[in-house]
């Protein structure tokens, strides 16, 4: 939109040299109001509007035009209706050999087929594969999902248990576990976004997924 929230967002992005595209003056900018008691979040109030197919066409055209020169594409799906055609984004990126990093949403991951990597949390992953009964079951179902969706890798975030990476390597799918360090955390907002942004940035800079 062109409201106060949009102005603040553009200023914050501009301070980090990030360009913002596709402003729609008729829309209310999606924003979230968090009510806190001390450092604990009690409630969150969201303000948002759904998107139309016409608006998605503008997004598709802008996406295709701006792809040149990029090292990675991050698709962070919040389930707000903005990402009408994720397969299109993946297809356009793959034409230019640009890896697509996806933070998924919902209980149907088929639309993410062909992405380089997806980064669901454990609940999202478990829901998608019909539940997890053990660590070996976790590994088997992760490998099946990678094959089904033609992914190069799968990173599952597991809260206090850290993260688990499954990655294709010379015809095999290897598992790597990354434990967490104990810390007092009062607000986990944006944790998934931080993971995928850090992962894509590091990997695009030449680091391996394991080191990223």
Model-predicted regions and their roles:
Residues 66-69, 84-114, 129-131, 135-211:
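Conserved phosphate-binding/catalytic region of the ribokinase-like
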Residues 11-14, 38-41, 117-121, 171-176:
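Short, hinge-like loop/turn segments at secondary-structure boundaries
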Residues 125-126:
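A generic structural signal for short hydrophobic patches within well-formed alpha-helices
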């Amino acid at each position: 939109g062109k409201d106060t929230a949009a102005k603040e967002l553009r200023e914050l992005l501009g301070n980090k040299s990030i360009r913002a595209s596709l402003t729609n003056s008729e829309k209310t900018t999606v924003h979230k109001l968090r009510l806190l008691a001390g450092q604990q979040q009690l409630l969150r109030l969201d303000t948002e509007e759904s998107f139309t197919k016409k608006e998605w066409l503008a997004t598709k055209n802008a996406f295709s035009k701006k792809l040149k020169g990029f090292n990675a594409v991050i698709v962070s799906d919040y389930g707000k209706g903005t990402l009408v055609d994720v397969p299109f984004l993946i297809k356009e990126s793959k034409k230019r050999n640009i890896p697509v990093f996806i933070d998924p949403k919902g209980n149907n991951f088929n639309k993410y087929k062909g992405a380089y990597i997806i980064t669901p949390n454990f609940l999202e992953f478990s829901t998608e594969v019909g539940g997890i009964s053990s660590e070996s079951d976790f590994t088997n179902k992760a490998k099946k999902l990678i094959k089904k969706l033609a992914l190069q890798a799968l990173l599952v975030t597991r809260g206090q248990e850290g993260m688990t990476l499954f990655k294709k390597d010379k015809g095999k799918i290897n598992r790597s576990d990354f434990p967490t360090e104990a810390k007092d955390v009062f607000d986990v907002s944006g944790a998934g976004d931080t993971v995928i942004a850090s992962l894509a940035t590091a990997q695009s800079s030449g680091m391996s997924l394991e080191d990223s």
